[in-house]
Structure formats: structure tokens, C-alpha cells
């Protein structure tokens, strides 16, 4: 595990312990279950939205709402999640990914709630999930999917977190960075597999990371390429290799109009 991931996970353990003191697990679970009965808050079908785009022959783009990152600092000074969400939806995003980590990405749960309320597309809670408490919390704040990152989770942990998510109607995006992580990810039930093109140790980005792992991905998985998609050439390279789902954040966050940037990149 990289130094930054070590720090994030250590911080996250403290965060979860503190959250438990503020809102009990039972209360989070009750809110999550209540949301599942609410017509406005029940899960919107994250995987379904991606597969619908792909079936229609379109690129399925998960567009990110992210204020800052550890490697790049502040990405967007004028940060209004509702406006960004509406712009993304208007320009054809399949889903949203909203950063809720406060310490390293300057995110918060409110950003996810604001973004989801402003649009009708499904929302991924982009955070560092280590504990079932966070899964219940994700559904309690309205998330439609969660992220599991193989780099810092044991297989049994991931299976438990996935089972918890599925019980609540949450979809799961499992993220890998290399072949050994991919082998573990394939042990999970989720059909949604993300390959991150960013090396979490060096923060270098290369699309070759996705291409080099393609042969290991079974046909029954929906592959999402993450990070480093910056040009029409990048998009076409992936689509030529039958990769039709993308997670893009930084390129859009730096644009004056994130939704217009989405349209331009995938036109």
C-alpha cells in the first residue's frame, strides 16, 4: 500500500470511530432502510444506468464532482455541487461520482446530497470504505453505489462490505490497479470493475494500465477505465479496445462548464 493510502486509511479509521459516537450504527441503518422506501431516495440503479448507455452504443461516463485532491490541491474554486450535477446530466452523463472524504479531498456528505437532489441520475459515493458503518451511511445520505478499493482491503473484508451494500440495494464499483488486485476483484459478485490508470505510489498516469489488464477481464464484467482520459484520442483508444465506460473527474473540474467539457471530450 502506498504512503498516501496508508495515511488515508489511518485517518478513515479515526473518522469512523468518531462518526459512531455521533450517529449510532442502528440509526444509520434505520435511515438507510427508510430511504429505500422513499420514492425520491430509493436506489436509482447505478450499474443499470451504465449498461443502458453501453447497450445504446454510447460511452457511459461517470462524471466526478471533486473539489480537491492530495496530488493536485484545489481543482475548482467556484464549487457548487448542484450546478455541476445539473450540467453533467444535461450533457449526457450516465452517473455521478461525488467525493465525500473531507481530510484529503475537501469533500463532505452534504455535497453528495446536494448533487443527488439536483439531478435524476445515479450517484456513487467516492470515499475510502473500510467499515460496514460507511455502507449504511452511504445509503443513509442517498448514495446509489459505493466504491471498494482492492489496494487496502482484504478479500473477506470486501465480500462483507459488498454483501452489506447489496442488502441495501447499493451497487458496487470495485477498483484495481494491477493484475494481483484484479484477481481478487474477480472474486466479488459485482459486474462493475474499475481499472485506475493512476499509480497510487507515484501518482503517474498511463492508459496502458487499462490496456495491459484487458485480457484478464471476463466478458460478464463491465469495465470502467478511471483517470487520464483527457482527449478524443484517449477516448477512441479505449473504445477501439471495447472499453465503453469511463470515470472522469479532474479534466472536467478544471473546465469553466464541466458539462460542456463532457460533451466536447466525448463528441
Curated annotation (Swiss-Prot):
**Which Pfam families does the UniProt entry name for this protein?**
IGPS
Q: What is this protein called?
A: Indole-3-glycerol phosphate synthase
- Give the signal peptide range: none
Q: Which GO terms describe its biological process?
A: L-tryptophan biosynthetic process
Return the NCBIfam families for the record: PRK00278.1-6, PRK00278.2-4
Which controlled-vocabulary keywords does the entry list? Amino-acid biosynthesis, Aromatic amino acid biosynthesis, Decarboxylase, Lyase, Tryptophan biosynthesis
Record's keyword annotation contains ATP-binding? no
Name the species this protein comes from: Polynucleobacter necessarius subsp. necessarius (strain STIR1)
The primary gene name is trpC
* GO MF, one annotated term: indole-3-glycerol-phosphate synthase activity
Amino acid at each position: 500500500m502506498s504512503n498516501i493510502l496508508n495515511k488515508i486509511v489511518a485517518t478513515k479509521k479515526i473518522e469512523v470511530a468518531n462518526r459512531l459516537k455521533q450517529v449510532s450504527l442502528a440509526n444509520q441503518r434505520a435511515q438507510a432502510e427508510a430511504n429505500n422506501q422513499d420514492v425520491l431516495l430509493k436506489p436509482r440503479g447505478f450499474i443499470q444506468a451504465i449498461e443502458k448507455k453501453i447497450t445504446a452504443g454510447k460511452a457511459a461516463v461517470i462524471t466526478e464532482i471533486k473539489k480537491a485532491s492530495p496530488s493536485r490541491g484545489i481543482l475548482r474554486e467556484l464549487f457548487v455541487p448542484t450546478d455541476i450535477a445539473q450540467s453533467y446530466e444535461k450533457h449526457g452523463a450516465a452517473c455521478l461520482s461525488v467525493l465525500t472524504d473531507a481530510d484529503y479531498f475537501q469533500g463532505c456528505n452534504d455535497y453528495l446530497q446536494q448533487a443527488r437532489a439536483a439531478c435524476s441520475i445515479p450517484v456513487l459515493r467516492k470515499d475510502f470504505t473500510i467499515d460496514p458503518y460507511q455502507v449504511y451511511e452511504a445509503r443513509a445520505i442517498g448514495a446509489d453505489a459505493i466504491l471498494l478499493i482492492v489496494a487496502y482491503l482484504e478479500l473477506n473484508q470486501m465480500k462483507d462490505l459488498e454483501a452489506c451494500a447489496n442488502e441495501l440495494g447499493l451497487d458496487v464499483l470495485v477498483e484495481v490497479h494491477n493484475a494481483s488486485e484484479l484477481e481478487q476483484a474477480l472474486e466479488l459478485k459485482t459486474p462493475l470493475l474499475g481499472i485506475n490508470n493512476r499509480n497510487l505510489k507515484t501518482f503517474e498516469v498511463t492508459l496502458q494500465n487499462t490496456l495491459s489488464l484487458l485480457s484478464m477481464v471476463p466478458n460478464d464484467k463491465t469495465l470502467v477505465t478511471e483517470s487520464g482520459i483527457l482527449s478524443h484520442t484517449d477516448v477512441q483508444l479505449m473504445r477501439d479496445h471495447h472499453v465503453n465506460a469511463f470515470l472522469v473527474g479532474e479534466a472536467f473540474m478544471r473546465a469553466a462548464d464541466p458539462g460542456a467539457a463532457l460533451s466536447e471530450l466525448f463528441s
